[in-house]
């Protein structure tokens, strides 16, 4: 299912660049109507009744079909404490779940950005730890479970005025990214890993330079 695959693969540390390109090309060829994957995803959103918004976040990233994204965001905002769920995840959630919060924030509005500042600040240290652990492990492609380019966009989009709060953490993240990482054992995804690491380093460098 191409659209579902795109949702799962957005920024995924275990997908290759070529695979992403192929999926995007296939998705563009599909009809926008009568598509089983799209209809199934839309039904899942419309019928969603879980107590948490967590499993809706996968539909909200910027590479998702806009119709699915809009429907999922609208559903999320019917939950009274949806922003609290996001901030709680940033504070205490597992790193893969933190990834989905930043995927949501990368392109969607929030109502009380001030409530996110401390949770975001705290999450940076955890992201740095995850990146550091991933880079040191030649078998790992995780890169800390977070799309660093998207993360930097989120900081600039929602929290530009709080750059001084985040700067120490981002400097620590930069140091984590500069680790001399051993070559990945997974030769198939080595190029993707190297390109992702380079792009992540550049995103952090650019953020620090533009937020002095």
Describe the function of each predicted region.
Residues 1-212:
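Extended repeat-based scaffolds of very large eukaryotic assembly and lipid-transport proteins
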């Amino acid at each position: 299912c191409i659209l579902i695959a795109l949702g799962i693969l957005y920024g995924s540390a275990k997908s290759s660049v070529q695979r992403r390109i192929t999926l995007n090309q296939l998705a563009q060829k599909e009809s926008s109507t009568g598509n089983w994957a799209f209809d199934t995803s839309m039904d899942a959103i419309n019928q969603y009744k879980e107590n948490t918004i967590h499993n809706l976040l996968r539909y909200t990233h910027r590479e998702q079909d806009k119709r699915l994204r809009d429907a999922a965001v609208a559903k999320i905002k019917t939950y009274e404490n949806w922003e609290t769920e996001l901030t709680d995840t940033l504070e205490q959630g597992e790193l893969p779940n933190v990834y989905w919060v930043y995927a949501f924030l990368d392109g969607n509005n929030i109502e009380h950005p001030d409530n996110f500042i401390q949770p975001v600040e705290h999450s940076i240290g955890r992201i740095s730890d995850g990146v550091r652990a991933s880079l040191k492990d030649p078998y790992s492609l995780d890169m800390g479970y977070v799309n660093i380019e998207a993360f930097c966009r989120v900081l600039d989009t929602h929290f530009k005025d709080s750059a001084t709060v985040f700067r120490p953490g981002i400097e620590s993240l930069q140091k984590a990214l500069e680790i001399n990482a051993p070559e990945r054992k997974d030769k198939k995804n080595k190029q993707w890993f190297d390109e992702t690491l380079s792009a992540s380093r550049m995103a952090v460098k650019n953020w620090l330079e533009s937020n002095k």
